[in-house]
Structure formats: structure tokens, C-alpha cells
């Protein structure tokens, strides 16, 4: 526990110290910044804000985790677990980096196409499964305390879980500070679970990423001086999925990650309802003012028809939802 605290402090300090230099370099080189959605007019002023800040906190968290674990952890099984989780973080970070690179440096607005991104994510998920999950012999998922054996279909579950949550966190990263603190809340919850399970290797990884993310948040809160980009959001989502698998508490991510589930569900429901009503009535109709859900809140509060919410209000609401959901999971696991 003490080692994790030290690693978290080091990660925070290095991340917070390094980020201003990254931002300054970005600005000096006049690199194109984040593009904003025209439908949310209050965001247009952010156009050109440096992005890809996830590169910094991912490098910091990975480096600190590796250095501390190599010098302090002698158990080969623990080192294998750490390397497994870090591998999926790095792989998805590279996918996100490539997507950001194409958008910003090559001026390709969509970056990777949806098919290209999905293919790379599936390839990364397969590598994670065959190199780190399959050798462990795990083929069942924990469903509210009951082990559901999936056999060979566990492979498809892992792919769905990792790809799904990486994209879900990516959708959540739409306003200042929302994704970074939402992930911190999720990681703190998994840190408690890892501590109770005596999984101090996983706890070390969690601590270093929390520290690095908080260092990043110093420059990502409103008004944001930097965004994490796909390099950060895709990697963080994959990390949460991998941690839930490593701790054998897969089901908990549906509740701990309720914000990501809500954001993704809003997009899926909007698309389905729009297509359905267009086919039935000849015109597409919407459930939400705009998706993902955080934009709906910005444009008209919970009802979508009320007063506009500020980014801080949206952040506070969704952080609160995430915190309550996380407390519910801990209560289910250790109280009830």
C-alpha cells in the first residue's frame, strides 16, 4: 500500500510537471488542435486547444509502473499480470495515437475509419487474450458472484468487453475534465477491490494511473488547456476492462462504469430511434437533444428542454452518478 502511494505521488508530480512543456511544444510548433462540434456553440472557442495529452500521462504511468514493479515485485506471476494489463493499455494507446495523428498532422478529419479502428481494436484484443488471458486458463465470468462458464466463447466476451469500454470512455471524453475524473473514480473503486483481494500488483498499476491522471487534470479542467485525445481515452477504457477481468469482477464495470454505459447507450438509442421513426413516419425523430448524453445535458438539462447546464454542472452531475454507482458496488460486495 505504501509503495502504491509513493508511485502515485511520483506519477502525479511527473505528469503535472511535464504537461506544461507538452502544451508549450504543441503551441510553438503550431500543431493543429482539437476540432469542435458546431452544434454545441459554447465549445467553438476551444477549437485549436492542444490534444493528445494522453500521450504524456500514459507514458508516465507506464514508466513508473514498470520501474517500481521491476525493483519491488519478485513474483513472476505478478509481473506477468502487470505486463498483461500494461500491454493492452499500450496497444490501445497506439491505436488512439494513430487516430489522433491522422486527424491533426495529416488533416484527415475522421482519422481512422470506423472499420480500420475496429479492426485494430480487435487485433489488440486478440493479442491480449492469447498472450495474457488464455494462458491463465480463465474461461468463465463472474456474474454477481456466480461463475458462468463460457468455454471458447470467453474469447468473444473479452473482445466485446475491451473494445466496448474503450469506445465508451472515448465517447465520454467530450467536455473538460469529464472523462479524466470519471476514470479516476472508477480506478479508485477498483483500487479498493484490489486491496481487499490483496492484489497489490494491480493496485500498483491503479495508483500510478490515478496519479498521472490527476496531474493531467490540473490542465484539463475547465477551461481546458489540453485534451487527452483518443490516445488517452481508448487506452483508459481498455485498462478498466482489463482490470475488471484481472480482478474477476467483470460485472462490476457495468455499474462502476455507469457513466460510460449511459453515454454509449444514448448514442445507440438515438441512432436506432431516428432510423425507426424515419422509416415509420417519414422523418427521423430524436430522444435526446444531442448525443452523447453529456451534450444533451449541456443543451437543456435532464429533460433536454430546461435551462442549459454549464460544463461544471454536467461534470458534477455525472461524477456524482459515477461515485454513487461505485459506492453501490462496494456495498454489494462487502456490506450486503
UniProtKB/Swiss-Prot annotation:
Membrane topology category: Multi-pass membrane protein
Location(s), subcellular: Cell membrane
Catalytic activity field: UDP-N-acetyl-alpha-D-muramoyl-L-alanyl-gamma-D-glutamyl-L-lysyl-D-alanyl-D-alanine + di-trans,octa-cis-undecaprenyl phosphate = Mur2Ac(oyl-L-Ala-gamma-D-Glu-L-Lys-D-Ala-D-Ala)-di-trans,octa-cis-undecaprenyl diphosphate + UMP
Keyword line: Cell cycle, Cell division, Cell membrane, Cell shape, Cell wall biogenesis/degradation, Magnesium, Membrane, Metal-binding, Peptidoglycan synthesis, Transferase, Transmembrane, Transmembrane helix
Metabolic or biological pathway: Cell wall biogenesis; peptidoglycan biosynthesis
UniProt superkingdom: Bacteria
InterPro entries: Glycosyl_transferase_4, PNAcMuramoyl-5peptid_Trfase, PNAcMuramoyl-5peptid_Trfase_CS
Location, primary (coarse class): membrane
Signal sequence interval, chain numbering: none
GO molecular function: metal ion binding; phospho-N-acetylmuramoyl-pentapeptide-transferase activity
Enzyme class: transferase
Transmembrane portions of the chain: 3-23, 53-73, 78-98, 118-138, 143-163, 174-194, 200-220, 226-246, 254-274, 316-336
Cofactor: Mg(2+)
EC number(s) given by UniProt: 2.7.8.13
UniProt GO cellular component terms: plasma membrane
A single BP term in Gene Ontology: regulation of cell shape
Protein family (similarity comment): Belongs to the glycosyltransferase 4 family. MraY subfamily.
Role: Catalyzes the initial step of the lipid cycle reactions in the biosynthesis of the cell wall peptidoglycan: transfers peptidoglycan precursor phospho-MurNAc-pentapeptide from UDP-MurNAc-pentapeptide onto the lipid carrier undecaprenyl phosphate, yielding undecaprenyl-pyrophosphoryl-MurNAc-pentapeptide, known as lipid I.
UniProt xrefs under HAMAP family: MraY
Protein's recorded name: Phospho-N-acetylmuramoyl-pentapeptide-transferase
Organism: Streptococcus pyogenes serotype M18 (strain MGAS8232)
Lineage, broadest ranks: Bacteria, Bacillati, Bacillota, Bacilli, Lactobacillales
Amino acid at each position: 500500500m505504501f509503495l502504491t502511494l509513493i508511485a502515485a505521488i511520483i506519477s502525479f508530480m511527473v505528469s503535472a510537471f511535464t504537461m506544461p512543456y507538452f502544451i508549450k511544444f504543441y503551441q510553438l510548433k503550431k500543431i493543429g488542435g482539437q476540432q469542435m462540434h458546431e452544434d454545441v456553440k459554447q465549445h467553438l472557442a476551444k477549437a485549436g486547444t492542444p490534444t493528445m495529452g494522453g500521450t504524456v500521462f500514459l507514458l508516465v504511468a507506464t514508466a513508473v509502473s514498470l520501474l517500481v514493479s521491476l525493483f519491488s515485485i519478485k513474483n513472476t506471476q505478478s509481473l506477468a499480470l502487470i505486463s498483461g494489463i500494461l500491454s493492452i493499455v499500450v496497444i490501445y494507446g497506439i491505436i488512439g495515437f494513430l487516430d489522433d495523428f491522422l486527424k491533426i498532422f495529416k488533416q484527415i478529419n475522421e482519422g481512422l475509419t470506423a472499420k480500420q479502428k475496429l479492426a485494430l481494436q480487435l487485433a489488440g484484443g486478440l493479442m491480449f487474450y492469447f498472450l495474457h488471458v488464455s494462458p491463465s486458463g480463465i474461461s468463465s465470468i463472474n456474474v454477481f458472484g456466480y461463475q458462468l462458464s463460457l468455454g471458447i466463447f470467453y474469447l468473444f466476451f473479452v473482445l466485446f468487453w475491451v473494445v466496448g469500454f474503450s469506445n465508451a470512455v472515448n465517447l465520454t471524453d467530450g467536455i473538460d475534465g469529464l472523462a479524466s475524473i470519471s476514470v479516476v473514480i472508477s480506478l479508485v473503486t477498483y483500487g479498493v477491490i484490489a486491496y481487499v483481494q490483496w492484489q497489490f500488483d494491480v493496485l500498483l498499476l491503479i495508483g500510478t494511473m490515478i496519479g498521472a491522471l490527476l496531474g493531467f487534470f490540473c490542465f484539463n479542467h475547465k477551461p481546458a488547456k489540453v485534451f487527452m485525445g483518443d490516445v488517452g481515452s481508448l487506452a483508459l477504457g481498455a485498462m478498466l476492462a482489463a482490470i475488471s477481468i484481472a480482478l474477476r469482477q467483470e460485472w462490476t464495470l457495468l455499474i462502476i462504469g455507469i457513466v460510460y454505459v449511459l453515454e454509449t447507450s444514448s448514442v445507440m438509442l438515438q441512432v436506432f430511434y431516428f432510423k425507426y421513426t424515419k422509416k415509420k413516419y417519414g422523418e427521423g425523430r430524436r430522444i435526446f437533444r444531442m448525443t452523447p448524453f453529456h451534450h444533451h445535458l449541456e443543451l437543456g438539462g435532464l429533460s433536454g428542454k430546461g435551462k442549459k447546464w454549464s460544463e461544471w454542472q454536467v461534470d458534477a452531475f455525472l461524477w456524482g452518478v459515477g461515485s454513487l454507482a461505485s459506492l453501490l458496488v462496494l456495498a454489494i460486495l462487502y456490506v450486503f
